[in-house]
Amino acid sequence: MVSSNFYKNLGPRKLTAIIDFLHDIIAPPKIHEDIAIHDIKILQEASPNDISFLSNPKYSEFLKTTKAAACIVPKNFTGEANPNTVLLHAQNPYFAYGKLIDFFYTPIKSYPAKIMKSAIVADSATIGKNCYIGHNVVIEDDVIIGDNSIIEAGSFIGRGVNIGRNARIEQHVSINYAIIGDDVVILAGAKIGQDGFGFSTEKGVHHKIFHIGIVKIGNNVEIGANTTIDRGSLQDTIIKDLCRIDNLVQIGHGVKIGKGSIIVAQTGIAGSSTIGKYCTLGGQVGIAGHLNIGDGAQVAAQGGVAQNIEAGKIVGGSPAIPIMDWHRQSIIMKQLLKTSNSKLKK
């Protein structure tokens, strides 16, 4: 059940209007124009007034028993379904679901074009049109914030930082030494632009190296809660356009992440490594320093990468090896343990 404390339901919507809104839907030739859809629900919970979706074949069985008025299914779906449920075929049901959420819901919380009285904004800072600056925000000298941006309560924007248009910076984010593009979302607690972990050791003493690089973040990037992105020592830390970075990710100094890459929670990338375009790093992946991960490469969850990965390769395990080799090793290890246990029992 979606809580009305936080989200406003814009329904009901006519099913015919939903089909028009989604554009790329293949629907039955005749649909009654009076069918009204009140909400979006998972198959198991949907009522005759709801629409649902099927993007994972694991849930196909629920399509037989669902009470949903309509369901978005894959384009090539030919399985069984409740005869009372209208099937809407889509190339990407999950993408269609994402669009439907925007069609049905809007947050209750709004952000007026306003600087709250408790915010501290330097006289030399430039705040764009229609911006919201929340309670106890600190914006230092020479900061530039683009039009239509939101800076939520308790965030800190350090001297000289440049943030583009349509940014959404959630609560208690700190940003220093950074240039950030348009349409960027930074979730609560993220820390951007602090010193990297750089020391030189002389006679048993670890001497801190002053970092003179910055962080550059492209357009349409999302950075998760409590993620940390260090600025470079000499070279900049760079996050290219369209990247999606999950919560609790550590990105070291001088790291470069290519366009459209996805990095899942609790991953750590050591300094000066380069991640190519449209790469995927699963949860808890570790990337050693000064490595190159080629375009389109994928690392399975908990993979430990200690050497370069060629473009398009899929690896897993620690140390990471080609994914099929990792699967074979796992099977062999299981068999060896089984044999060993049998011998011990004898």
Swiss-Prot record:
Please list the GO terms describing molecular function.
N-acyltransferase activity
Taxonomically, the superkingdom here is Bacteria
So what EC number does this one have?
A: 2.3.1.191
What InterPro entries would the database entry show?
Hexapep, Hexapep_transf_CS, LpxD, Trimer_LpxA-like_sf, UDP_GlcNAc_AcTrfase_non-rep
Q: Which reaction does it catalyse?
A: a UDP-3-O-[(3R)-3-hydroxyacyl]-alpha-D-glucosamine + a (3R)-hydroxyacyl-[ACP] = a UDP-2-N,3-O-bis[(3R)-3-hydroxyacyl]-alpha-D-glucosamine + holo-[ACP] + H(+)
Q: What is this protein called?
A: UDP-3-O-acylglucosamine N-acyltransferase
GO biological process terms on file:
lipid A biosynthetic process
The Swiss-Prot or TrEMBL record describes its family as follows: Belongs to the transferase hexapeptide repeat family. LpxD subfamily.
One GO CC term of this entry?
membrane
Which UniProt key words apply to this protein? Acyltransferase, Lipid A biosynthesis, Lipid biosynthesis, Lipid metabolism, Repeat, Transferase
Name the pathway it acts in.
Bacterial outer membrane biogenesis; LPS lipid A biosynthesis
Task: Give the function comment from the record.
Answer: Catalyzes the N-acylation of UDP-3-O-acylglucosamine using 3-hydroxyacyl-ACP as the acyl donor. Is involved in the biosynthesis of lipid A, a phosphorylated glycolipid that anchors the lipopolysaccharide to the outer membrane of the cell.
Question: Subunit composition?
Answer: Homotrimer.
A Pfam family it matches: Hexapep
**This protein's encoding gene:** lpxD
User: Where along the chain is the active site annotated?
Assistant: H253 (proton acceptor)
Cite the PROSITE patterns for this sequence: HEXAPEP_TRANSFERASES
In its UniProt entry, the species of origin is given as: Rickettsia africae (strain ESF-5)
